[in-house]
A protein has these predicted regions:
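Eukaryote-biased recognition of intrinsically disordered, low-complexity regulatory segments
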Residues: 2-22
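Ferredoxin-type iron-sulfur electron-transfer modules in oxidoreductases and energy-metabolism complexes
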Residues: 30-42, 89-255
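Active-site phosphate-binding and catalytic loops of NTP-dependent enzymes
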Residues: 44-50
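Short, structured protein-protein interaction patches enriched in aromatics and acidic/basic residues
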Residues: 53-60
Length: 255
């Protein structure tokens, strides 16, 4: 059974834009992306929207629907009342390219800043082994489809553009946490990097990133909070503290 519903779709580019009202047919079983495609086909032939798999596994169609970051391909029209106006806008934290398409290159830049996995120097192909519990501990994080909705909803980025230079965001702090807990990774400075370079201290664990994750990854509880705890343990470790005092005293004597 079909029905006519009201949509408000953001149209424009980085210089100017606004919401456009449109009435469109909605059929049983459809998702928001289906309706956007119908609007493209019948009323707005030049409407720009990014999408790919239409199965909730590529993260391409992330946008804000009624003010909340969602995947358009996974948001069912049956969740809206017939009289409700569905407002569709681009992800607010990133610059608009056109219409519903945003420039998410900020995330690619942050990904490149994260040092990659560093295996033991003397290891040969096929020699590395891990306990199953270590494999399972970080398996959750690898479910990420890079929709960047966690990045978009994080208020440190969303409300403070100036923080982007010094804050990696929940998606890439999660990556730092994953590598830091990897038993075979040889880098020992990941906690320092997370705190001093990638802005872990900016996160105040509101869990908004966890709430919007379409893969239901517990970003805050299983990645960010444990990483914060390890950073604190390292900074206030009594042996490390005593060692730093001794070294500082020796430096003073030498000078």
């Amino acid at each position: 059974m079909s029905r006519i519903m009201n949509f408000r779709i953001w149209r424009g580019d980085k210089s100017d834009g606004g919401l456009r009202d449109v009435q469109v047919e909605v059929n049983e079983g459809e998702v928001v992306l289906d309706v956007i495609h119908r609007v493209q086909a019948t009323q707005m032939g030049d409407l720009a929207v990014r999408w790919n798999c239409k199965a909730g596994k590529c993260g391409s169609c992330s946008m804000e629907i009624n003010g909340k970051p969602r995947l358009a391909c996974m948001t069912r029209m049956s969740t809206f009342e017939d009289s409700e106006t569905v407002t569709v806008t681009p992800l607010r934290a990133f610059p608009v390219i056109r219409d519903l398409v945003t420039d998410v290159s900020f995330n690619y830049e942050k990904a490149r800043e994260i040092p990659s996995f560093t295996p033991p120097a003397d290891s040969k192909p096929g020699e590395l082994r891990m306990q199953q519990e270590d494999v399972e501990r970080s398996q959750e994080f690898r479910k990420c489809i890079e929709c960047y909705m966690c990045q978009n909803v994080c208020h440190v980025i969303r409300d403070h553009e100036e923080n982007k230079k010094s804050f990696a965001g929940p998606r890439y702090l999660m990556r730092m946490a994953e590598l830091d807990m990897h038993p075979l990774d040889q880098r020992r400075d990941r906690k320092d990097l997370a705190q001093e370079v990638h802005g872990l201290g900016f996160c105040n664990i509101t869990k908004c990133c966890t709430e919007v994750c379409p893969e239901h990854i517990k970003i805050t509880d299983n990645a960010l909070i444990p990483l914060k705890e390890r950073v604190v343990d390292m900074k206030y470790d009594p042996i490390r503290w005593l060692g730093s005092k001794i070294l500082k005293r020796e430096d003073i004597k030498q000078n």
